Amino acid sequence: XXPQQLGHVKAAXSDY
């Protein structure tokens, strides 16, 4: 759930 920046990919509102 929360907006997380995974390395170079921004996952907004995603748990991935």
Swiss-Prot record:
Which keywords appear in this protein's UniProt record, sorted alphabetically?
Antibiotic, Antimicrobial, Secreted
Out of the domains of life, which is the source?
Eukaryota
So what does this one do? Antibacterial activity against Gram-negative bacteria.
Organs and tissues of expression: Plasma serum.
UniProt entry tagged with the keyword Membrane: no
Protein's name according to its UniProt entry? Salmocidin-3
- Compartments where located: Secreted
Biological process (GO), any one:
defense response to bacterium
The answer to whether the entry has keyword Transmembrane helix is: no
Which is one Gene Ontology cellular component term of this protein?
A: extracellular region
